[in-house]
Regions:
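Ferredoxin-type iron-sulfur electron-transfer modules in oxidoreductases and energy-metabolism complexes
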Residues: 1-21, 36-70, 81-86, 114
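Catalytic alpha/large subunits of respiratory electron-transfer oxidoreductases
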Residues: 19-20, 25-26, 30-31, 37, ...
Length: 257
C-alpha cells in the first residue's frame, strides 16, 4: 500500500495561505518571484517526492507583488488568506474598474457580496499592468469595512456629533447660498478617480458657477501650460524599449505601488 504524501504548511506571511499537500511542483510561483517580482525568495528544496516549495527561512515574502502567486497557482496550494471562507465565487457580483491606489491605473475587477467588497482581482491589460496588481491594490479594500466613517459628523461647540444626511445637505446648501461664488473653491483627494473628479468639476462649474478647483496636495505645483510637464514621454508598455532611463531621487518599486 502506497504511503500518503503529506506536506506541512508553510508560513508565507499574512497574505498567502498555504496547503502544500496540493502542490504539483509546477514552480510557477518560484518563477514569478524571481523573474517578475525580482525577489528570489521562493524556491524548491529536496528531490523527487520530497521536493517542497518554501521561502527557505519560513518568513513572509518581501515583495509588493507577492499575492500574485495566488492567481498563478493552478491547484489551490497558495490561496488568499484574508479571503478564506468569505464567500463563494458564484455569490459575488463582479465589477470592472480601475485602481486608484496609485498612479499606474491598473485594470481590476472588484467582487462584492451585498454591500461588502470581498476581493480585488487583476484584469489583463498588456499596455498597463499586464496581469499583475500590487498587494496594496489587492487588499486595500479591507479598510472599507472596518474603522471607516460611514456617518456624517457636524461640529458643535468644538465637538463632532453624528448627524443625518439630510441635515448635512441642508447645511451645505445654506453655506453655498450665503457665500459669494468668487470665494468658493473645490479640492479632490489623491484617491479620487477620474469619473468622480469630472462630476465634481461639472458640479462646481454648472451649479456653483466657479472654476476654482484643484487636485494637488500641499506644496506641489504643476505648470499645466505645457503638456510635457504632466505627461510622461513614454507609455508604460514602452518603457521596455527605452534605451536609457534616468531616475533622480525616486524609487519606483516603493513609490509607484
Amino acid at each position: 500500500k502506497e504511503n500518503k504524501r503529506i506536506v506541512t504548511e508553510k508560513n508565507m506571511g499574512p497574505l498567502i495561505k498555504t496547503q502544500m499537500t496540493r502542490c504539483i511542483h509546477c514552480t510557477r510561483c518560484v518563477r514569478f518571484a524571481t523573474e517578475i517580482a525580482g525577489v528570489p525568495e521562493l524556491g524548491a528544496i529536496g528531490r523527487g517526492e520530497d521536493m517542497q516549495i518554501t521561502t527557505y527561512l519560513e518568513q513572509s515574502m518581501q515583495s509588493e507583488l507577492s499575492a500574485n502567486v495566488v492567481d498563478l497557482c493552478p491547484v489551490g496550494a497558495l490561496t488568499s488568506k484574508p479571503y478564506v471562507f468569505e464567500a463563494r465565487p458564484w455569490e459575488l457580483k463582479k465589477t470592472e474598474t480601475i485602481d486608484v491606489m496609485d498612479a499606474v491605473g491598473s485594470n481590476i475587477r472588484v467582487d462584492t457580496y451585498d454591500w461588502e467588497v470581498k476581493r480585488v482581482l487583476p484584469i489583463i491589460n498588456e499596455n498597463i499592468n499586464e496581469e499583475w496588481i500590487s498587494d496594496k491594490t489587492r487588499y486595500a479594500c479591507d479598510g472599507l469595512l472596518q474603522q471607516r466613517l460611514d456617518t456624517p459628523f457636524i461640529k458643535y461647540n468644538k465637538k463632532f456629533e453624528k448627524a443625518s444626511w439630510n441635515e448635512v445637505y441642508k447645511i451645505i446648501k445654506s453655506k453655498f447660498e450665503h457665500t459669494q461664488k468668487e470665494k468658493i473653491c473645490g479640492f479632490v483627494g489623491d484617491l479620487t478617480n477620474m469619473e468622480t473628479s469630472f462630476i465634481f468639476k461639472e458640479f462646481l462649474e454648472r451649479t456653483i458657477g466657479t472654476k476654482k478647483y484643484d487636485f494637488r496636495p500641499t506644496k506641489s505645483f504643476i505648470n499645466n501650460s505645457k503638456r510635457e510637464n504632466y505627461l510622461f514621454n513614454s507609455t508604460i508598455n514602452g518603457i521596455e524599449e527605452a534605451d536609457l532611463i534616468l531616475l533622480i531621487g525616486t524609487n519606483p518599486r516603493f513609490e509607484a505601488t
